[in-house]
Amino acid sequence: MSLKNPATDTGVDDVVDRDVSLLSEDDIYLFSEGSHFRLYDKLGAHIITVDGREGTVFGVWAPNAEKVSVIGDFNGWDDHRHELTPRGDSGIWEGFIAGVGRSMPYKYVIQSAYDNLRLEKADPFAAHGEVPPKTASVIWDLSYDWGDEKWMTSRAQNQKPEAPMSIYEVHLGSWMRVLEENNRSLSYRELARKLTDYLLEMGYTHVEFMPVMEHPFFGSWGYQSLGYFSPTSRYGIPQDFMHLIDTLHQNGIGVILDWVPSHFPVDGHGIGNFDGTHLYEHADDRKGFHPDWKSYIFNYGRNEIRNFLISSSLFWLDKYHVDGFRVDAVASMLYLDYSRKPGEWIPNEFGGNENLEAISFLRRFNEETHKNYPGTITIAEESTAWPMVSRPVFLGGLGFDMKWDMGWMHDTLAYFSKDPVHRSYHHNKLTFRMIYAFHENYVLPLSHYEVVHGKGSLLVKMPGDDLQKFANLRLLFGYMYAQPGKKLVFMGGEFGQWAEWAHDRSLDWHLLESSLHNGLQHWMKDLNHLYRTESAMHESDFSPDGFKWIDCNDAVHSTISLIRRDGQGANELIAVCNFTPVPQHNYRVGAPRSSFWKELLNSDASVYGGSGQGNLGSLEAAPVPFHGMSHSLNLTLPPLSAVFLRPVEDPS
């Protein structure tokens, strides 16, 4: 029966239909057991039709509530009009309200059983939200006509370990702005055209978005997320974000999302203290509050929280067709004493500092992701020496596909920041990585971490005058691409952004009017092309068979030389890097075969802004044994350069 107030008739029923439920007995069983990973189809706000009337069924988990109501414009934000009904002892409250539909803002009012608290909360499962700083959820449907079937069919092949992966890390709000329109960010639909065209031009295989999940504080860059099921409304509606991903897919570009299951902010409308109790976060601050970030930590040992988080990950794979996740701050999850002093943490049941509940959660997350969506990838941002991060769960690993090599990033940038006259004393920073390079499946990141908080841009870190700074940065990228491992570069680095990154301003695209910046960008295009088209550069990124030092010990000349091979060992490339500003003539390196060797790329070429020194396009390996090989090459190494060579039968 529907009762209406004729004085305020909006077409919305005043009575909640308590008999309508999206939950079966199986749903409630799986929910309580911790194995319901499609909760986004059950909880939240879902538009349905009942007895010929369209409306919305609401569902929210609040086990310690005495009463739960839905409020919104449709009832004057009056929490006495639309009360929900508890479903048994599941802790879930539900109800159907006819006449309530798409675009309507809403919140839950939770009357807690503890301390008589009245709490106004956004929906943890909301599909959409108001533009911050407003905090209400918005009823929305997620229908969309996808056109990316070709990509989805071939995705597993495109993302296998042997495939090239060159990732462009992007903050959507600051990649490009419209200065003439009050410095506004681009919308999802504007980005669909501009960003896709740019990625195609540059030759990247993937884009990684810093967190797009709704977040109240723009200055958190998205890393303090609350909308685990909604893309931020700052740039458009959910279908606009789908269009962005669809456009990228139709152009052969994969999409990786930063995902943050490690912590969440304390904002009053969020999931913290949700029903007046510590529902999502651990009740003990020693496990439930992060001292550095001043944020809550999820209670990974609770079944319902595992449901919530794994449902979030599967939601993005299901509804938004994303191709994988880079999981943020994994180290903070693994260690109970992370960033804590003695006495500020609780040992596990065996007396250790390992967070056993978080480890179990991460393994289950990876298992469910790969089982439900084969061909998708997970990447751990893990900064310690925790073993087997990127090894399968059945072998005792955490189950990630890859892990960021944070040590490489730190050592490499420390080396490059030194004046070349001192580099010979720090040569091990270039070579140490190969001791552990194949213990995990690594991504080599030059990420946003290194261009914020006063660290300066990549270009500013480089020593010397402007010409040398650009030469050093071209060399850095060349050295990076010569190393085994997938590649990631943060936006702006590819053309030599001078300014440190700021989330509220655009990249300085006008710099490309300069030949040096334009030349650096051209170098990155050609590096990506080489990496993608030469099997030796990517097929064995995770195998020691694909890498061999020619000479890693020439610290006197600050020079390294190496061989990259493909999976069959049939295709080989030589890379030689000179980390000094002095050209080195008649520099001999061993060669694995007799043939002509074509100079594929040379970072000192004039087209990139270099001095134009090199090896005249190709040279022949001489039958002069060197470096344990039967033949050798007598090279000219330009200053601050990376040179790539490939054997060819016909030097022309």
Predicted regions and their residues:
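The feature marks proteins involved in alpha-glucan
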Residues: 1-57, 87-169, 174-183, 190, ...
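Conserved, mostly hydrophobic/aromatic
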Residues: 60, 108, 170, 199, ...
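Short proline/glycine-enriched turn/loop motifs at strand-loop junctions of beta-rich domains
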Residues: 61-68, 592-594
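Short, surface-exposed loop motifs enriched in S/T, G, D/E and P with embedded aromatic residues
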Residues: 80-88
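C-terminal beta-strand-rich structural cap/linker in extracellular carbohydrate-active enzymes
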Residues: 102-106, 616-652
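Substrate-binding/active-site clefts of carbohydrate-active enzymes
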Residues: 130, 149-162, 171-354, 619
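Conserved alpha/beta catalytic core and glycan-binding cleft of carbohydrate-active enzymes
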Residues: 132, 321-323, 338-504, 532-604, ...
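Catalytic cores of secreted or luminal carbohydrate-active enzymes
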Residues: 516-537
